[in-house]
Structure formats: structure tokens, C-alpha cells
């Protein structure tokens, strides 16, 4: 397992090195030096709005659970989890925000984890909606269609199973048996029915809130698509917003499928591969570097400050 964790970051670095090599690094640097900083500043404003929408979405989930949380509590439970989860494959570390919330308010993790699961499902569905259009532009092979279909199928089946209290109880039963050696889980095993009920209640989301959350999820990813559009525009590349957003969403999905931490390497590689059909690879890579810096690395930088204070 440890060797597996070491290989993934190395694979990410290797993909980035290969991309930069074939993009002609001096040409990429030359393109980046001509960046229009005014457009980048507009992108930063949109980025701040995108982060705020993420926190609003989390607050809505907590409101659905009748958890009275301040904006500070929402931020300090969400942002550190975002920072840590980006180091995990497919951001599977997201549920740690439930731990941070428990640490601050004493709220049971089993009560809030379902909201995190639904939120991640909304993200993936939003990305599929935005990214599916690019599939019809290129003959990307049947395996891509199969992967996207399997992602949606797993999400639907997974949520359907977890919403079933009996199934959830059995899953917890297996979990507690496997990890019964842990002293804290021994106590939790005795409260399995109580934990299962809390977990199951977390999936009872009002339709009105679920609809708003879905719209917010779409808005988050569209705003990040706009940031990429501005990044390309800032280096003199004029492509349609629709095209950039669709390729961006599809690339993020492919990054999730590869299970590389934060999708680093795989997202950029797929993005550049598709975009090189429209513009020179050096311009594609330069725009992607700018876009990823704005939508990923700056968010990581901001989130790290919240992490230090938790």
C-alpha cells in the first residue's frame, strides 16, 4: 500500500514532464510571459465567488440536517477537508470535513457523511452533464463511454443502497467486524443501530434543498470553466466558452477515473490532448497551466490557511 501511495505522485509528475517536453517548454514560457493580468484579476474574483458558493452549498446540507452552523464553522470544516482531500485519489478524503465539524460542534460524523457523499455525487453528475458534449466531437473510443457510464451507475446504485437502512446496517456490521480490533470501534459496534439510524437520516434531503444544491454544483463547475476561458483569453487564445467548459469538465472526470491525487497530471494531459486539435500544443499547455493554477493551486493555498487553524 505504501509503495502504491509513492507511485501515484511519481506518475503525476511523469505525465506533467511528458506534457511539458512535447509542448516545447521555452515556447510555453514565452506564451505565459504575454499574459493579460487584467483578465487574470477578473478570474480571481470569479474564483472567490466559486469558493463562496461551495461553502453555501455545505451550509445548505447542514441546514437540512437541522445543524445550526455559522459561516465560520462551515468554512473551517469545509476548507481544510478540501485541502487534504486533494492529496487523495479521486478526493476520497472529503468525508474528513465531518470529523472537523464534529471537533467544533460535537455533531456525529455518521449524521453528516451522507451529505458529503451526495455532494460528491452532484459534482460528478454536473461534470458528466458539462463534459458529455465533447464525447460527440471526437472518436475517443468506446472505453471512455463505458467509464463515464460506470461512474454514473456506481453513483446511483451506491446512493440507492446506502439509503436503504437494512443495507446500511449490514455494511456497518461488516465494517465493525473487520476493524473490531480498534478500541473506539469496539464501543461503536455496540451502538451500531443508533449509528445506522443517524447515517440513514443523513440521506433524507428535502427536494427543495436538493434542487438548489444541484444548481449550485453546476454553477461551481461552470464558474471554473469560465476561469479557464479567461485564462486562455489572457494569453490571446480565443475559443468558445462552451468548448473550454466541456473539455475542462471531461478532463476533470478523466482525472477522477485515473485515481491520481487531485487528478494532477492526468487532467492536464487529457485537456491538452483534446485542445491540441484546435490550437498549438504550446498554447494549450500554457492556458492549462494558468487555469489549473487558478482553479486548483490557489484554492489549495487558501485552504491551507484554514487547515493550520483547525
Task: Give the residues covered by each predicted segment.
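Juxtamembrane helix-entry segments on the extracytoplasmic side of multipass membrane proteins
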Residues: 32-42, 142-151, 204-211
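Membrane-embedded helical hairpins/re-entrant loop segments and their flanking transmembrane helices
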Residues: 55-78, 231-247
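Alpha-helical transmembrane segments of multi-pass membrane proteins
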Residues: 73-80, 242-253, 283-293
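Helix-boundary and loop/linker segments of multi-pass membrane transporters
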Residues: 28-36, 67-71, 104-105, 199-206, ...
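Alpha-helical transmembrane segments and their immediate interhelical loop/hinge regions
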Residues: 189-234
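Transmembrane helix-loop-helix hairpins in multi-pass inner-membrane proteins
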Residues: 1-33, 81-185, 260-310
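Alpha-helical transmembrane segments of MFS and MFS-like solute carriers/permeases
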Residues: 42-46, 212-219, 251
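Hydrophobic/aromatic residues in alpha-helical transmembrane segments
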Residues: 54-61, 80, 97, 224-231, ...
